[in-house]
Amino acid sequence: MKVVLSLGGSVLSNESEKIREFAKTIESVAQQNQVFVVVGGGKLAREYIKRARELGASETFCDYIGIAATRLNAMLLISAIPSAAKKVPVDFMEAEELSKLYRVVVMGGTFPGHTTDATAALLAEFIKADVFINATNVDGVYSADPKSDTSAVKYDRLSPQQLVEIVSRSSAKAGTNVVIDLLAAKIIERSKIKTYVILGTPENIMKAVKGEAVGTVIA
């Protein structure tokens, strides 16, 4: 089975022990599956982008800084995964080529203007993944931002079309925190790849790989 895991930068802590826990889980999954991991930029990206804006950088240049940060995080994770390719691919074709030699391929961002969620969804489509797992800091897709709206309802299961509708609605509201971005949602709809949106813990990743009920399932 081909598994694509989007690991948010906020989920991948700077603590070495937590990185090791994720690495062990990925190694375990890779024993019987081909695993592709796309890592977010997290705090590192935010700090560098903030400084770059203060220094007058364009938004596109800031995107490139964010991409560089995701690739640094990818290298950090690779350091803890013996079976992973030691090279961070810069595009999907290179990722696919590396997967012929390694059970685990870890990459960061690719295109300016694309989040790593969108990158991971596009990668999943490109390699014809069997499952796409979006590991984030929320335990699924909600009707509203659960951190600011106590009446928000969590969805256990959604169709790809419903996901696009919910994300479109949320994205239109200023200042809202969307668990998955609109481009990623549209790619999921187009590719029809089974998707899990989960709270990013090693345990939840294993559950999603096994097809157990966890987070929000989009199918």
UniProtKB/Swiss-Prot annotation:
<dbReference type="GO" id="GO:0005524">
    <property type="term" value="F:ATP binding"/>
</dbReference>
<keyword id="KW-0963">Cytoplasm</keyword>
<feature type="binding site">
    <location>
        <position position="46"/>
    </location>
    <ligand>
        <name>ATP</name>
    </ligand>
</feature>
<dbReference type="GO" id="GO:0006225">
    <property type="term" value="P:UDP biosynthetic process"/>
</dbReference>
<comment type="similarity">
    <text>Belongs to the UMP kinase family.</text>
</comment>
<feature type="binding site">
    <location>
        <begin position="110"/>
        <end position="116"/>
    </location>
    <ligand>
        <name>UMP</name>
    </ligand>
</feature>
<keyword id="KW-0808">Transferase</keyword>
<feature type="binding site">
    <location>
        <position position="42"/>
    </location>
    <ligand>
        <name>ATP</name>
    </ligand>
</feature>
<comment type="pathway">
    <text>Pyrimidine metabolism; CTP biosynthesis via de novo pathway; UDP from UMP (UMPK route): step 1/1.</text>
</comment>
<dbReference type="GO" id="GO:0044210">
    <property type="term" value="P:'de novo' CTP biosynthetic process"/>
</dbReference>
<keyword id="KW-0665">Pyrimidine biosynthesis</keyword>
<feature type="binding site">
    <location>
        <position position="63"/>
    </location>
    <ligand>
        <name>UMP</name>
    </ligand>
</feature>
<keyword id="KW-0547">Nucleotide-binding</keyword>
<dbReference type="InterPro" id="IPR011818">
    <property type="entry name" value="Uridylate_kinase_arch/spir"/>
</dbReference>
<comment type="function">
    <text>Catalyzes the reversible phosphorylation of UMP to UDP.</text>
</comment>
<feature type="binding site">
    <location>
        <position position="137"/>
    </location>
    <ligand>
        <name>ATP</name>
    </ligand>
</feature>
<feature type="binding site">
    <location>
        <position position="145"/>
    </location>
    <ligand>
        <name>ATP</name>
    </ligand>
</feature>
<feature type="binding site">
    <location>
        <position position="142"/>
    </location>
    <ligand>
        <name>ATP</name>
    </ligand>
</feature>
<protein>
    <recommendedName>
        <fullName>Uridylate kinase</fullName>
        <ecNumber>2.7.4.22</ecNumber>
    </recommendedName>
</protein>
<comment type="subunit">
    <text>Homohexamer.</text>
</comment>
<dbReference type="InterPro" id="IPR036393">
    <property type="entry name" value="AceGlu_kinase-like_sf"/>
</dbReference>
<dbReference type="InterPro" id="IPR001048">
    <property type="entry name" value="Asp/Glu/Uridylate_kinase"/>
</dbReference>
<dbReference type="GO" id="GO:0005737">
    <property type="term" value="C:cytoplasm"/>
</dbReference>
<dbReference type="GO" id="GO:0033862">
    <property type="term" value="F:UMP kinase activity"/>
</dbReference>
<feature type="binding site">
    <location>
        <position position="136"/>
    </location>
    <ligand>
        <name>ATP</name>
    </ligand>
</feature>
<dbReference type="InterPro" id="IPR011817">
    <property type="entry name" value="Uridylate_kinase"/>
</dbReference>
<feature type="binding site">
    <location>
        <begin position="9"/>
        <end position="10"/>
    </location>
    <ligand>
        <name>ATP</name>
    </ligand>
</feature>
<feature type="binding site">
    <location>
        <position position="41"/>
    </location>
    <ligand>
        <name>UMP</name>
    </ligand>
</feature>
<keyword id="KW-0418">Kinase</keyword>
<dbReference type="Pfam" id="PF00696">
    <property type="entry name" value="AA_kinase"/>
</dbReference>
<keyword id="KW-0067">ATP-binding</keyword>
